[in-house]
Amino acid sequence: MKTVRIETFGCKVNQYESEYMAEQLEKAGYVVLPDGNAAYYIVNSCAVTKEVEKKVKRLIKSIRNRNKNAKIILTGCFAQLSPDEAKNLPVDMVLGIDEKKHIVDHINSLNGKQQVVVSEPGRPVYEKVKGSFEDRTRSYIKVEDGCDNTCTYCAIRLARGTRIRSKPLEIFKEEFAEMVMKGYKEIVITGVNLGKYGKDMGSSLAELLKVIEKVPGDYRVRLSSINVEDVNDEIVKAFKRNPRLCPHLHISVQSGSDDVLKRMGRKYKISDFMRVVDKLRSIDPDFSITTDIIVGFPGETDADFQRTLELVEKVEFSRVHIFRFSPRPGTPASRMEGGVPESKKKERLDVLKEKAKDVSIRYRKRIIGKERKVLAEWYVMKGVLSGYDEYYVKHEFVGNRVGEFHSVRVKSLSEEGVISCRADMVEGKVPARG
C-alpha cells in the first residue's frame, strides 16, 4: 500500500491545490492519510514571510528525523522561489508550482536521486476538484492564478507569475454545481488575485457571482481575500442581491498611511478603502471586514503607525492579521532605505495586537442578542459544537449535528468568538471545560 501525507502551508489557493493533488494520487492508487507515518510526504509550502519559511524547514527536518526512509517532495511558493535553497534540505524532490498538476507522474519518477523540477509559472487554470475535502462541510474552488499588481514587498507574484490566468466560466459552473450536489455547505471562491478574475478573457468576478445566484441548494458562498480597488459597485450589488453570499470580505489594507501605501506600491488611498467600507456597511451595518496589516515597513514613522491605529479603531475590523515586515529576496522593498529596527517592529506589533483585540471585542459585543446561521464544523466537547457564521465569527453552542447549519442567538463573548444558544431556546449554556 502506497501511503501519502500532504502538509499544507499558507493560503486557500494552496489548500485547493493540495486537495487537487490528493484526488490525483487517490485515482492512481495511493492512500492519502490525514495523520500518522506515510511512505511519501508532500510539503506544499508558502513563502509570504521568513517565519513561514522557517516553519516549512522545521517540518521537513522533523519528518526526516522520525522517518528516515520516507520520500519527501517539497513544492509550493518556497520551492518555486528558492529551488537552490530547497534542494539543500533533506528532500527527495523539489517541484515548482505548475508541477503540482502532474504530481502522480513526478512521484512515480522518484529514482533514489534528488530531482529538482521547477518551471516558469504560467499554465492555464483548468484543474477541477471533484470534492473529497476532509471535513465535508467547506470546500474551495480556485478560479484564478497569477498577480499583475506591483506591490514592492511581495514575492508571491514572482512565484505565481505576473499574468492573470482565469478558470473558464463553463469549467467553474461544472465544479461549483458538483460541490453543491455533493452537499458542501460552504464553498469558498479563491484565487491569488481574486478580484482580477476574468481580466484575461473578457469576463469579471461580478459575472462569476451572477452564475452562483442561479444554482439552487442549501449552501452559502464566501469570497477569499480581495484588494481594495477590486471591490467595485457590481461586487457590492452582488452582496445585496444574493443572500447566500456571506457578508464578509478579507480586504488587505496593509497600512493606514497613504505615504506607506505609496511605497508599498498599493493602488489605493485610505479614502478609497473607507468608501468601500461605507458601501458594504450600508448594505449591512454588521458586514464583517477582516484584514492584513504590515508593521515596520521601510520608512514607516510613528505618525504613519498612528494612522494605522486610527484606521483600525474607525473601521472596527472583526479580525486583523498582523505581520512584521519581512524583506523578501528579489523585491524592491528589500532594497529600500529607512529600515525600521526589529525592536520598534515588535513594539508596534504588540500595540496593534491590543488595538485589534479591542475592536474585535467591540464588534462581537454589538452582535449579542442577534440571530446568526452557523455551520457546525467540529465538537469542542461532547454535546458542544463549534463553527463559523456567515460573518466569519466563531460560535460555541449546545448541539449534536456536525456538518449542518444551525440558527443560533448570540449570548456572550468567548476568547476568540461568541457563546450562543439555539435560536429557539431561551437558554443554551455551554458547559465549562475541564
Swiss-Prot record:
Domain MTTase N-terminal: 2-112
Radical SAM core domain sequence ranges: 133-362
CDD domains attached to this UniProt entry: Radical_SAM
Binding site for [4Fe-4S] cluster 2: C147, C151, C154
Reaction it catalyzes: N(6)-L-threonylcarbamoyladenosine(37) in tRNA + (sulfur carrier)-SH + AH2 + 2 S-adenosyl-L-methionine = 2-methylsulfanyl-N(6)-L-threonylcarbamoyladenosine(37) in tRNA + (sulfur carrier)-H + 5'-deoxyadenosine + L-methionine + A + S-adenosyl-L-homocysteine + 2 H(+)
Cofactor annotation remark: Binds 2 [4Fe-4S] clusters. One cluster is coordinated with 3 cysteines and an exchangeable S-adenosyl-L-methionine.
GO MF terms held by the record: 4 iron, 4 sulfur cluster binding; metal ion binding; N6-threonylcarbomyladenosine methylthiotransferase activity; tRNA (N(6)-L-threonylcarbamoyladenosine(37)-C(2))-methylthiotransferase
Pfam families: Radical_SAM, UPF0004
Location within or outside the cell: Cytoplasm
InterPro entries referenced in this protein's UniProt entry, alphabetically: Elp3/MiaA/NifB-like_rSAM, Methylthiotransferase, Methylthiotransferase_CS, Methylthiotransferase_N, Methylthiotransferase_N_sf, MiaB-like_bact, rSAM, rSAM_horseshoe
Keywords: 4Fe-4S, Cytoplasm, Iron, Iron-sulfur, Metal-binding, S-adenosyl-L-methionine, Transferase, tRNA processing
GO BP terms, alphabetized: tRNA methylthiolation
Names of required cofactors: [4Fe-4S] cluster
EC numbers on record: 2.8.4.5
Chain positions recorded as [4Fe-4S] cluster 1 binding sites: C11, C46, C77
PANTHER family found in the cross-reference section: RADICAL SAM PROTEINS, THREONYLCARBAMOYLADENOSINE TRNA METHYLTHIOTRANSFERASE
Function in brief: Catalyzes the methylthiolation of N6-threonylcarbamoyladenosine (t(6)A), leading to the formation of 2-methylthio-N6-threonylcarbamoyladenosine (ms(2)t(6)A) at position 37 in tRNAs that read codons beginning with adenine.
Protein family according to the UniProt entry: Belongs to the methylthiotransferase family. MtaB subfamily.
Name recorded for this polypeptide: Threonylcarbamoyladenosine tRNA methylthiotransferase MtaB
UniProt organism field: Thermotoga maritima (strain ATCC 43589 / DSM 3109 / JCM 10099 / NBRC 100826 / MSB8)
Lineage: Bacteria, Thermotogati, Thermotogota, Thermotogae, Thermotogales
